[in-house]
A protein has these predicted regions:
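Membrane-embedded, hydrophobic transmembrane alpha-helices
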Residues: 2-134
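Short juxtamembrane and helix-loop transition motifs at transmembrane-helix boundaries
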Residues: 8-17, 38-40, 213-222, 237-243, ...
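Aromatic-rich transmembrane-lumenal/periplasmic boundary elements in polytopic membrane proteins
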Residues: 115-184, 188
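Short hydrophobic/aromatic helix or loop-helix immediately within or flanking a transmembrane segment
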Residues: 163-228, 232
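Transmembrane-helix motifs of polytopic, lipid-linked glycan transferases
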Residues: 224-248
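Transmembrane-helix signature of polytopic, membrane-embedded enzymes
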Residues: 242-264
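Short acidic/glycine- and proline-prone juxtamembrane loop motifs at membrane-interface regions
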Residues: 270-279
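Specific aromatic-rich, kink-prone transmembrane helix
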Residues: 280-290
């Protein structure tokens, strides 16, 4: 009989010393993105301009991370948000201008599809590890806990509780207010995570009664389910980008190129375990794919 005792240990105890700070990853991702996507033979192209503006939003994220770490630097926080809002406004204008462009030649990446596949696989593995050991979003943990509460209630008691009470719980725990369907997105992962952790505790004779098993395993269930949901969200985004390019443009290599660019964005690594960011992006993307 195989016991999944590995799930009861923090991932940072398994992968000791695996840590890349934001400045290092910012530098490496910038260098890789420029080397792969920048057209050095045609510098004055719209693609190069888009790449520069896309990567140019990364310092704003770093400013926000530093301001959150210090909790005192209000200037960095304000400057970071102004930078992000300005960059978002530029991309809104850019998308509105895109249908008016008559000539948009396709420019291939500076690496062949085989190398792009190897690089994308390595980056996806790195992103999964970061989501497994990095800081998890409080909204994801709160959603998993609410999903667990739903699973423990009977159908009659669940139907009697209005949805605004769930929103109040999320707002109390995270400071944000989500809709009543937010825990449902995490329930698919919360159910097997609950069964996996509780069965492991029972098999190891950590606790005896079922009720005590649930109480002991609840924090571990929330962490595992939130991280697993974030990982599945990233995988859904990768496959969505590839399939969107294949179905809408008939170019599988283009989808692979876009997916690797997503994996190179420092933002994806900075908040790898934030389900409130990843799931929203995955749902928006798949609404375009289908």
């Amino acid at each position: 009989q195989i016991h999944f005792a590995i799930t009861l240990r923090p991932m940072n105890q398994i992968l000791q010393g695996f840590e890349i700070n934001s400045v290092t990853w910012f530098t490496v991702s910038w260098a890789l993105a420029i080397a792969i996507y920048f057209k050095f033979t045609r510098i004055w192209t719209l693609r190069n301009l888009d790449l520069i503006f896309l990567l140019g939003m990364t310092p704003a994220w770093m400013f926000l991370e530093q301001s959150r770490a210090s909790d005192t630097d209000v200037y960095l926080n304000r400057f970071g948000y102004i930078w992000l809002f300005s960059g978002t406004f530029w991309w809104l204008v850019r998308m509105l201008m895109d249908p008016m462009l008559r000539r948009r030649p396709q420019l291939d990446a500076n690496i062949n599809p085989s190398g792009m596949t190897v690089l994308g696989t390595a980056l996806l593995a790195f992103l999964i590890v970061e989501a497994a050991i990095g800081p998890v979003g409080e909204s994801g943990v709160a959603a998993v806990e609410e999903a667990g509460d739903w699973l423990q209630r009977s159908p009659q008691s669940s139907a009697e509780i209005p949805s605004h009470l769930y929103q109040a719980v999320s707002e109390k725990k995270t400071g944000l207010q989500f809709g009543p369907a937010w825990p449902l997105l995490h329930m698919v992962v919360a159910i097997p995570s609950r069964a996996l952790v509780t069965s492991d505790l029972v098999s190891n004779q950590a606790v005896a009664p079922d009720q005590e098993v649930v109480q002991v395993a609840e924090p571990e269930i929330s962490q595992i389910a939130a991280r697993t949901t974030a990982i599945l969200g990233h995988v859904a985004i990768i496959f969505g980008l590839v399939l969107a390019a294949y179905w809408h443009y008939g170019n599988l290599v283009l989808g692979l190129t876009i997916a690797v660019l997503y994996l190179l964005l420092p933002y994806a690594v900075f908040h790898a375990a934030r389900t409130d960011h990843v799931l929203v992006g995955a749902l928006l993307l798949w609404s375009v794919v289908v």
